[in-house]
C-alpha cells in the first residue's frame, strides 16, 4: 500500500476527550488468534533449491495472510470504530505470527548460505522474509505495538478543531481545515486552524510515540539494524545514501532560497511588518498548507503576471460539472493512452473516492492499496474537485498502475525503491498540469506560450515542487534522530522546529514548547510512513520526465512536455514498473535514464527560466536570501482567538467599500434634503419626515456597519479600505434597539426644536427670538438690567425646558457609545482625533495660552469696572457673564467700544461702512467667494446660490438660525444656512462657513466615508484662516471697508485687541464645554449637579459668574446650541489653535514679511495650493499628515497664536502692571448678589451660593471646594505674576507638539 505524498495531507483536529483518550490507552489488547496450520512453513532443504521451494510456498501463504490483514486495515480506515480497530489488531497479530514463523524458519535454514545464492532474485526474497520487524517482539509487546499504531491512527483521523465558544462548529482535517489553510487569508483564522490542529493531535500523540519508538527500535535491532531508521534506509541499498541526499539538497538549495525570498516579500505586502520579517523565517501557517510543505494554494497572491490566463483550472472543473469519479476516469485515460493498463472492475466497485456522507469517521489521507490477490486494487481519497486534487488523483493512480504491472512478481518483490513508487503518478501529473494538456482535456480555452505565461506556470509548479524539497528532506532527518537517540523525547519539539527553521526558513506562529508534539500533527508520523521517499521522488520524477519526453519525441523546453498518448514513453515506463524490486533500483534507473544515480540536474533544467526570473526579482528588491534573524517570531493578533471568523480578503473589502459608497450617497442625500427642509421651515410635518429619514439613515448605518464588522482590517495593505471600514464599523446611534433609537431621535429633535423656536417676551407683550433680537441686544446694549433680563430670560425659557430631556439623552448617547466599544460617549467623541494623549495635549495647549487670557481678563474687567462701577464689577473677582457682549460670554468683540486701548485711533469695525455702502448678505458671500478664488481655489457652484438660505426668511417661517454649512453628497450641491446680519462679525462668520464649503468641494471626489476634515478642528479652521486675512486693516481697506490700512502702533494694538476679544476670549469657553460634557458622560457629574458643575468650570477657566441666582432647576448649558444639538465642541478649541499655525505657514508661503498679524494671503496661489492639497486629503490620512502638508510638521502648537498676539501681550503686561491688576479672580466667591448671598433666602431654608439657589448642605460642600480652588488659584496667581513679567523679555515662540481644531459654527455635514 503506497501512501500519497504528505504534501497532500489533511487539516485541523480536536483532541479526543480525556476519557476517550484514557480508554484508548487502557483498551486491553485483543486475544491472540491462532494461525491456520496450513499457512505455517513446512520442511525445506537448507540449500538454494530448497530455498526456491521455500519462497514459492511462502508466496502462496503470504497472499492469503496479507489479503486478510489489508482487508481489516481497509475496513478500519474507511469506518473507524472500536470493533474495526480490534479486528485490525487481531489481523496484525496473525500477520506478525506468520512473519515470525516464516522469518525464523528462513534464518534457521538459510542464514549461513543465502547471501551466496546464485539467483539474485531469490536472495532478495529470502532477505525480505528473514526481516521480522515487529514480529521479533514477544506477544505482549507485539500487542502493545499494534495497539499503539491503532490508537495513534485513531487520534489523528478523528481529531477535530472547534470554533471558539461554539461547541456545534467543529472542523475535521479534511476537508475543513485543509480548505481554511488553502483559501483563508485571515492571519488569525489561519493561526487558529494551525494551532488548533497541532494541539489537538500532537499533544495526545507524544506519549504514544515515545512508546512506539522504543518498541520499534527493539524489534529492528533483532534483525541486525542499529535502529528503525537504519532499517528504513536499508531499502535504498546504498551505503552513501545520506551523503547523496545531502549533496542533492545543497544542489537545490539556491533555488529554494530564491523562491522563499520572493514569497516572503509578497507575504510582507499582504500581512505587513508586524507578521513578516524580511530577514527572518516565515510564520508556518501563511503558506497555504497545514505543514507549509507545498505553497501552491497561495499562487493567487504571488502570481508574477496576474493579467495572464489563470492556470488554476479549479473553477472550470466545477463549471463543467466534474466530480470525483470523472477525475479518476480522466487519470485512467492518461495511463491507457500510454499503452498502460486500465483499472480493474474491483477498483471502481470497492474504492472510496469521496468522503462518505453517512457520518462515518474515516482516514481521509489519500492512499493506494494492494490487496495481494492480483486483482483487488483500491484508492481511498476524500476527493474534492480542484486542480490540486487532480494531481493527487494521478499520483494515487500511479501507485495502482505500479501494483498492476508487478502483480505477477513474488509478494516479496511487489514493491520498489519507495521513491520510485511515489514518482510514477507525479511523472504523469507533470504532463497533466501543462497548459497544453489542460487545453486538450477542455480545461483551458487557449494556450499562451509567451515568456510571462511560462513564468506564471513555472512559479506555480515551483510552489508545489521546490517548496516541498526542504520539508521532504527534514521529516526523516528528525525521525532518524529520534530513532538513534540523538533527539530524546525531552527535545522532540525543539529539534523539530530547529530543522524546520534551518531547512525551510519557517517558524511557529505561536509559542511552542515540549508539551507540544508538532511533528505528530503530520500524518506520516503517527501512521509510521517513512518520508524520505518523497524527497527522492521529487528528484526522480524529473529524471523520469526528461527520459520519457525524449522517448516521446518532445522538442522544446522540458516544462512544456506532455507525454499524453505516447506509447513509446508508456513502454519505457512499463519496464520500470514491471520490475518491482526484483532488481537493484540503480539498474532499473539506468535502463530508464541512462544513469544509475539520483541527479537533480533535470529538475534544475525544468525550472531554469523561473530560477533566473526569481534571481532578477530578488536582486531588484534587494532581498536577503535566507533568514539571518532566525530567532524572530511574530506576535499574536489582537483579539485572538475571538476574532478569527472575520474576513481578511481585501478584494472583498474593496467590493464592500464600493457598494457602501454607492448606497451612502443616495441615502444621505435624501436625509440631507429632509434635514434642510426641517431646519429652514420647522413644522410638525417636516419633523415627521426628518424622523423617518433618520430611521432610514440608522438602518443604512446598521446594515453596512454590521457588514463592515465582518472584516478584520488589521493587516490590510490598502490604507484607504482599512480606514473606511474602520470608520463604518462604528454604528453610532444606529446600534441602539429600534424603540430606543426612535425615542433618542425624538429627544434630539425635541431639544433642537425647543432651542430653535424659543422666544422671550417683555411685559408689554413683545417677543424676541435669539436671532437676531437677543443676540443684537447682548451685543449693543450697555444697560446692566436690560442685559440681565435678556440673559436670564433666555436661560429660563430654553435651559429649563431642555433639562427634562437631557438625562435620557445622556443615557442613550452613552449606551450607543458602549455598544460601539467605547468606554462612554466622551471616549467616542475623542476617538475622532486618533490621538491617545488628546486630553493631556489639550490641557498643555490651554496652559500655554492661559497667561494671555488672564491678562486680557484683567484688562477687560478694569474697563467694565469703569463703565458699570464697583457695585457690579469686583476687580479681584469673576466677571458677571452677561456683560461681555455675547449670550455665552464666549467672544467679547462686541464690547470693543468699551475696552479699545486707543479710542481716538480710527475704528477697526467695518460694520458702518458695510451698511453705508449697501452691502447685503449675498454681497458678503460673494466677497468671501472672491477671496477663495483669488487663492486659486474653487468657486461655489450655481446650486449654492440657488439653494442656500443666506438670510432669515421674512415669510414667518420658523428656522434654525444657527449658521451651518451643508454637503448633500452628490458632488455639486453645497449650501449655507445663516441668518446673516450685515456687520463685521457676520462677515467673519461668512468666511468661516465658506471655508466648510471649500473643504466639501475639495474632497468631493473621495469615497464618501472620507469626505470629512482631517479631524473636526480642521474643518472649523479653514474659513477662519481666511478670516484672519480678511480682518486685517490692509484687506478691509483693499475692499473699501476702511479708509486707511492703519499701520501705526496704536492701530496695531487696537486691531490685536479686537482680535483677542474674539480669539483669546474664546479659548477657555471652547475648552470647558466638552470638559463638562465628558464628565457628564463618564458619570463624575450627575444630573443633580449639572448646573453647579457647569458654573464651577466657567468660574475655573473663564473667571465668570452668573449674574443672577442659579439653582439645580436651571440648566444653563442647555442654553448653548451645541448642547441640545449634541454637537461636540472641543473642535472649536482645536480650530482656534491650528488656524494660527495654518496662517503662519500660509503667510510664509505667500512671501509675507513683517508681524504675523499684518499678513493678508489674498491672491497668493502658493498659499492656496498648500491649503487645497491639505483639504483634498479629507479624512483619508491621519490629521498629522494633513498638518504636515500645510505647516511642514505634524504637531499642534500654540506658539503661532502667541506669536500673533505678542505685541498685544507686551502691551497688556505693561498696562496691567501700571494698574497693579491681580491676575485671576482670588475673590472667586463674589457674585453681583453677594449682599444677598451672605444669609439664607427668606422663608426657604436655602442659601444663595455662587449665584445659585442651593440647600445649606450643598452650599457647605461648595464652600470647601471653592476654598481649595482659592488656595490653588492664589498659588497659581503668584506663580503666573512672576512668569508673566519674565515673558516680556523672552520670545513667546516656544516649540510645541500636540493636536489641532476650529470655530464657533456648527458643521452639519456628518
UniProtKB/Swiss-Prot annotation:
Effect of residue 727 to E: No effect on activity. 20-fold reduction in catalytic efficiency
Residues engaged in binding chloride 2: 795, 1094, 1098
Entry's EC annotation: 3.4.15.1
UniProt keyword list: Calmodulin-binding, Carboxypeptidase, Cell membrane, Cytoplasm, Disulfide bond, Glycoprotein, Hydrolase, Membrane, Metal-binding, Metalloprotease, Phosphoprotein, Protease, Repeat, Secreted, Signal, Transmembrane, Transmembrane helix, Zinc
Cofactor: Zn(2+); chloride
Binding positions for chloride 1 per the UniProt entry: 236, 533
Subcellular location: Cell membrane; Cytoplasm
Mutagenesis or variant effect for residue 809 to F: No effect on activity. 20-fold reduction in catalytic efficiency
Residues given in the record as chloride 3 binding sites: 833, 1131
Disulfide-bonded cysteines: 162-170, 364-382, 549-561, 761-767, 961-979, 1147-1159
PTM section of the record: N-glycosylated.
Binding site for Zn(2+) 1: 395, 399, 422
Transmembrane segments: 1261-1281
GO cellular component terms listed in the entry, alphabetical order: cytoplasm; extracellular region; extracellular space; plasma membrane
Entry's cofactor comment: Binds 2 Zn(2+) ions per subunit. Binds 3 chloride ions per subunit.
Site (Cleavage) location in chain: 1236-1237
GO terms under biological process: angiotensin maturation; bradykinin catabolic process; hormone catabolic process; hormone metabolic process; kidney development; positive regulation of systemic arterial blood pressure; regulation of blood pressure; regulation of synaptic plasticity
Membrane topology summary: Single-pass type I membrane protein
Role this protein plays: Dipeptidyl carboxypeptidase that removes dipeptides from the C-terminus of a variety of circulating hormones, such as angiotensin I, bradykinin or enkephalins, thereby playing a key role in the regulation of blood pressure, electrolyte homeostasis or synaptic plasticity. Composed of two similar catalytic domains, each possessing a functional active site, with different selectivity for substrates.
Name of protein: Angiotensin-converting enzyme
Organism: Oryctolagus cuniculus (Rabbit)
Gene: ACE
Amino acid at each position: 500500500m503506497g501512501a500519497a505524498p504528505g504534501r497532500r495531507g489533511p487539516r485541523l483536529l480536536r483532541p479526543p476527550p480525556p476519557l476517550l483518550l484514557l480508554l484508548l490507552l487502557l483498551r486491553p489488547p485483543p486475544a491472540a488468534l491462532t494461525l491456520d496450520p496450513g499457512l505455517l512453513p513446512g520442511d525445506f532443504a537448507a540449500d538454494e533449491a530448497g530455498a526456491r521451494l521455500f519462497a514459492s510456498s511462502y508466496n502462496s501463504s503470504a497472499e492469503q495472510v496479507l489479503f486478510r490483514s489489508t482487508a481489516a486495515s481497509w475496513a478500519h480506515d474507511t469506518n473507524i470504530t472500536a470493533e474495526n480497530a480490534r479486528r485490525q489488531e487481531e489481523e496484525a497479530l496473525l500477520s506478525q505470527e506468520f512473519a515470525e514463523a516464516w522469518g525464523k524458519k528462513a534464518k534457521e535454514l538459510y542464514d549461513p548460505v543465502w547471501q551466496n545464492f546464485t539467483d539474485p532474485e531469490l536472495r532478495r526474497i529470502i532477505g525480505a522474509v528473514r526481516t521480522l520487524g515487529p514480529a521479533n517482539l514477544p506477544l505482549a509487546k507485539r500487542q502493545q505495538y499494534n495497539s499503539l499504531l491503532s490508537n495513534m491512527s485513531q487520534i489523528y483521523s478523528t481529531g477535530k478543531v472547534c470554533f471558539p465558544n461554539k461547541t456545534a462548529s467543529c472542523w475535521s482535517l479534511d476537508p475543513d481545515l485543509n480548505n481554511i489553510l488553502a483559501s483563508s487569508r485571515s492571519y488569525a483564522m489561519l493561526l487558529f486552524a494551525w494551532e488548533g490542529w497541532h494541539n489537538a493531535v500532537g499533544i495526545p500523540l507524544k506519549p504514544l510515540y515515545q512508546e512506539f519508538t522504543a518498541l520499534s527500535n527493539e524489534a529492528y535491532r533483532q534483525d541486525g539494524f542499529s535502529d528503525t531508521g537504519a532499517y528504513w534506509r536499508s531499502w535504498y541499498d546504498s551505503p552513501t545514501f545520506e551523503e547523496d541526499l545531502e549533496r542533492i539538497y545543497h544542489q537545490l538549495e539556491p533555488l529554494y532560497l530564491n523562491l522563499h525570498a520572493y514569497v516572503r516579500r509578497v507575504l510582507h505586502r499582504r500581512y505587513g511588518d508586524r507578521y513578516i520579517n524580511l530577514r527572518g523565517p516565515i510564520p508556518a501557517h501563511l503558506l497555504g498548507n497545514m505543514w507549509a510543505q507545498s505553497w501552491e494554494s497561495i499562487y493567487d497572491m504571488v502570481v508574477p503576471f496576474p493579467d495572464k490566463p489563470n492556470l488554476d483550472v479549479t473553477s472550470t472543473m466545477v463549471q463543467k460539472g466534474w466530480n470525483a469519479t470523472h477525475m479518476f476516469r480522466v487519470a485512467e485515460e492518461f495511463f491507457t493512452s500510454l499503452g498502460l493498463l486500465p483499472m480493474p472492475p474491483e477498483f471502481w466497485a470497492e474504492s472510496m473516492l469521496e468522503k462518505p456522507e453517512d457520518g462515518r469517521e474515516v482516514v481521509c489521507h489519500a492512499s493506494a492499496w494492494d490487496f495481494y490477490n492480483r486483482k483487488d486494487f483500491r484508492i481511498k481519497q476524500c476527493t474534492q474537485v480542484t486542480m490540486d486534487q487532480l494531481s493527487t488523483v494521478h499520483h494515487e493512480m500511479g501507485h495502482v498502475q505500479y501494483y498492476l504491472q508487478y502483480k505477477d512478481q513474488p509478494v516479496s518483490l511487489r514493491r520498489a525503491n519507495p521513491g520510485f513508487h511515489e514518482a510514477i503518478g507525479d511523472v504523469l501529473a507533470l504532463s497533466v498540469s501543462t497548459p497544453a494538456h489542460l487545453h486538450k482535456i477542455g480545461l483551458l480555452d487557449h494556450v499562451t506560450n509567451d515568456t510571462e505565461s511560462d513564468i506564471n506556470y513555472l512559479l506555480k509548479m515551483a510552489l508545489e515542487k521546490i517548496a516541498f524539497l526542504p520539508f521532504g528532506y527534514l521529516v526523516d532527518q528528525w525521525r532518524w534522530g529520534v530513532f538513534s537517540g540523538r533527539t530524546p523525547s525531552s527535545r522532540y519539539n525543539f529539534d523539530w522546529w530547529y530543522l524546520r527553521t534551518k531547512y525551510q526558513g519557517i517558524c511557529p506562529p505561536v509559542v511552542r514548547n515540549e508539551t507540544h508534539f508538532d511533528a505528530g500533527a503530520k500524518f506520516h508520523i503517527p501512521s509510521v510512513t517513512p518520508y524520505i521517499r518523497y524527497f527522492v521522488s521529487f528528484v526522480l520524477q524529473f529524471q523520469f520526465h526528461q527520459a520519457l519526453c525524449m522517448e516521446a519525441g518532445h522538442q522544446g523546453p522540458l516544462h512544456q512536455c506532455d507525454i499524453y498518448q505516447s506509447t513509446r514513453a508508456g513502454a519505457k515506463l512499463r519496464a520500470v514498473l514491471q520490475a518491482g524490486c526484483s532488481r537493484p533500483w540503480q539498474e532499473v534507473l539506468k535502463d530508464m535514464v541512462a544513469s544509475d544515480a539520483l541527479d537533480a540536474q533535470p529538475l534544475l533544467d525544468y525550472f531554469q527560466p523561473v530560477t533566473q526570473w526569481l534571481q532578477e526579482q530578488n536582486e531588484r528588491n534587494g532581498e536577503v536570501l535566507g533568514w539571518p534573524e532566525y530567532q524572530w517570531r511574530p506576535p499574536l493578533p489582537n483579539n485572538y482567538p475571538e476574532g478569527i471568523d472575520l474576513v481578511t480578503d481585501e478584494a472583498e473589502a474593496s467590493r464592500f467599500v464600493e457598494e457602501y459608497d454607492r448606497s451612502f450617497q443616495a441615502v444621505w442625500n435624501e436625509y440631507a434634503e429632509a434635514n434642510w427642509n426641517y431646519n429652514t421651515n420647522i413644522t410638525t410635518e417636516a419633523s415627521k419626515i426628518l424622523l423617518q429619514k433618520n430611521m432610514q439613515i440608522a438602518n443604512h448605518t446598521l446594515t453596512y456597519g454590521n457588514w463592515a464588522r465582518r472584516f478584520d482590517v488589521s493587516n490590510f495593505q490598502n490604507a484607504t479600505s482599512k480606514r473606511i471600514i474602520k470608520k463604518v464599523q462604528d454604528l453610532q446611534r444606529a446600534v441602539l434597539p429600534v424603540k430606543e433609537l426612535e425615542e433618542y431621535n425624538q429627544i434630539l429633535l425635541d431639544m433642537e426644536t425647543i432651542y430653535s423656536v424659543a422666544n422671550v417676551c417683555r411685559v408689554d407683550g413683545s417677543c424676541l427670538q435669539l436671532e437676531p433680537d437677543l443676540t443684537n441686544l447682548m451685543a449693543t446694549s450697555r444697560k446692566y438690567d436690560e442685559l440681565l433680563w435678556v440673559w436670564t430670560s433666555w436661560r429660563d425659557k430654553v435651559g429649563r425646558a431642555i433639562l427634562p430631556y437631557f438625562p435620557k439623552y445622556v443615557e442613550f448617547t452613552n449606551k450607543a457609545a458602549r455598544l460601539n466599544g467605547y468606554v462612554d460617549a466622551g471616549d467616542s467623541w475623542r476617538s475622532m482625533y486618533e490621538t491617545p494623549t488628546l486630553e493631556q495635549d489639550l490641557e498643555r495647549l490651554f496652559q500655554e495660552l492661559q497667561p494671555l487670557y488672564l491678562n486680557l481678563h484683567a484688562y477687560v474687567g478694569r474697563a467694565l469696572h469703569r463703565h458699570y462701577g464697583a457695585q457690579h464689577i469686583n476687580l479681584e473677582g469673576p466677571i458677571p457673564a452677561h456683560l461681555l457682549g455675547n449670550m455665552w460670554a464666549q467672544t467679547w468683540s462686541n464690547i470693543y467700544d468699551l475696552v479699545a486701548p486707543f479710542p481716538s485711533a480710527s475704528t477697526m469695525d467695518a460694520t458702518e461702512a458695510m451698511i453705508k455702502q449697501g452691502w447685503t448678505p449675498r454681497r458678503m458671500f460673494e466677497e468671501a467667494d472672491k477671496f477663495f478664488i483669488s487663492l486659486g481655489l474653487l468657486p461655489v457652484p450655481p446650486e449654492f446660490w440657488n439653494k442656500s438660505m443666506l438670510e432669515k426668511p421674512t415669510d414667518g417661517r420658523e428656522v434654525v438660525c444657527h449658521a451651518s454649512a451643508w454637503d448633500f453628497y452628490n458632488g455639486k450641491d453645497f449650501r449655507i444656512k445663516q441668518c446673516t446680519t450685515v456687520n463685521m462679525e457676520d462677515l467673519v462668520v461668512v468666511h468661516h462657513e465658506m471655508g466648510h464649503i471649500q473643504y466639501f468641494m475639495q474632497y468631493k471626489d473621495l469615497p464618501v466615508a472620507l469626505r470629512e476634515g482631517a479631524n473636526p478642528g480642521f474643518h472649523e479652521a479653514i474659513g477662519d484662516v481666511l478670516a484672519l486675512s480678511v480682518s486685517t486693516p490692509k484687506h478691509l481697506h483693499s475692499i473699501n471697508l476702511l479708509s486707511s490700512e492703519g499701520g501705526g502702533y496704536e492701530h496695531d494694538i487696537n486691531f490685536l485687541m479686537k482680535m483677542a476679544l474674539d480669539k483669546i476670549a474664546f479659548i477657555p469657553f471652547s475648552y470647558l464645554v466638552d470638559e463638562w460634557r465628558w464628565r457628564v458622560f463618564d458619570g463624575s457629574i450627575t444630573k443633580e449637579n449639572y448646573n453647579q458643575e457647569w458654573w464651577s468650570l466657567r468660574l475655573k477657566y473663564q473667571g465668570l459668574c452668573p449674574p443672577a441666582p442659579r439653582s439645580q432647576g436651571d440648566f444653563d448649558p442647555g442654553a448653548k446650541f451645541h448642547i441640545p444639538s449634541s454637537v461636540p465642541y472641543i473642535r472649536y478649541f482645536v480650530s482656534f489653535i491650528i488656524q494660527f499655525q495654518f496662517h503662519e505657514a500660509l503667510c510664509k508661503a505667500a512671501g509675507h514679511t513683517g508681524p504675523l498679524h499684518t499678513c493678508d494671503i489674498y491672491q497668493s496661489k502658493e498659499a492656496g495650493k498648500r491649503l487645497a492639497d491639505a483639504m483634498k486629503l479629507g479624512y483619508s490620512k491621519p490629521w498629522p499628515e494633513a498638518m504636515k502638508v500645510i505647516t511642514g510638521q505634524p504637531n499642534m502648537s500654540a506658539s503661532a497664536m502667541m506669536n500673533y498676539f505678542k505685541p498685544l501681550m507686551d502691551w497688556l503686561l505693561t498696562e496691567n502692571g501700571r494698574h497693579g491688576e491681580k491676575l485671576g479672580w482670588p475673590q472667586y466667591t463674589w457674585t453681583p448678589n453677594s449682599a444677598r448671598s451672605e444669609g439664607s433666602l427668606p422663608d426657604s431654608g436655602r442659601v444663595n451660593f455662587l449665584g445659585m439657589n442651593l440647600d445649606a448642605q450643598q452650599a457647605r460642600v461648595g464652600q470647601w471646594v471653592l476654598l481649595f480652588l482659592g488656595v490653588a488659584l492664589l498659588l497659581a496667581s503668584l506663580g503666573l505674576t512672576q512668569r508673566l513679567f519674565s515673558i516680556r523679555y523672552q520670545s513667546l515662540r516656544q516649540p510645541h507638539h500636540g493636536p489641532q481644531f476650529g470655530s464657533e459654527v456648527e458643521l452639519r455635514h456628518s
